[in-house]
């Protein structure tokens, strides 16, 4: 019986410049910030921006809403 998740070999690496070829952000270009080989996903600078609601902390007693990049599947990008 196998355990764990198999790593997928990806065609992009950190700091590669890529273009999104499908999805809502089609045509946008950016630099790869992080790669998740277990999930086959990458985070690209300035692409797939979503709002994240943060809990209140001592530094931000009201809580906050921040915008950050979320991962997209590596098959939706190509090197440029």
From Swiss-Prot:
GO molecular function: rRNA binding; structural constituent of ribosome
Family annotation (InterPro entries): KOW, Rib_uL2_dom2, Ribosomal_uL24, Ribosomal_uL24_CS, Ribosomal_uL24_KOW, Translation_prot_SH3-like_sf
UniProt superkingdom: Bacteria
Keywords noted in UniProt: Ribonucleoprotein, Ribosomal protein, RNA-binding, rRNA-binding
Gene Ontology annotations for the cellular component aspect, listed alphabetically: ribonucleoprotein complex; ribosome
UniProt-listed PROSITE patterns: RIBOSOMAL_L24
Region feature (Disordered): 53-80
Similarity field: Belongs to the universal ribosomal protein uL24 family.
HAMAP family: Ribosomal_uL24_B
Subunit structure, as described in the record: Part of the 50S ribosomal subunit.
NCBIfam families according to UniProt: rplX_bact
Record PANTHER family: MITOCHONDRIAL RIBOSOMAL PROTEIN L24 (PTHR12903)
Described purpose of this protein according to its UniProt entry: One of two assembly initiator proteins, it binds directly to the 5'-end of the 23S rRNA, where it nucleates assembly of the 50S subunit.
Protein's UniProt name: Large ribosomal subunit protein uL24
Originating species: Chlorobium limicola (strain DSM 245 / NBRC 103803 / 6330)
Gene name linked to the record: rplX
């Amino acid at each position: 019986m196998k355990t764990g998740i198999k790593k997928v070999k990806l065609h992009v690496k950190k700091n590669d410049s890529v273009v999104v070829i499908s999805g809502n952000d089609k045509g946008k270009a950016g630099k790869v910030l992080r790669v998740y080989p277990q999930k086959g996903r990458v985070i690209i600078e300035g692409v797939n921006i979503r709002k994240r609601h943060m809990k209140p902390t001592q530094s931000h007693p009201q809580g906050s809403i921040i915008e950050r990049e979320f991962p997209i599947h590596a098959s939706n990008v190509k090197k440029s």
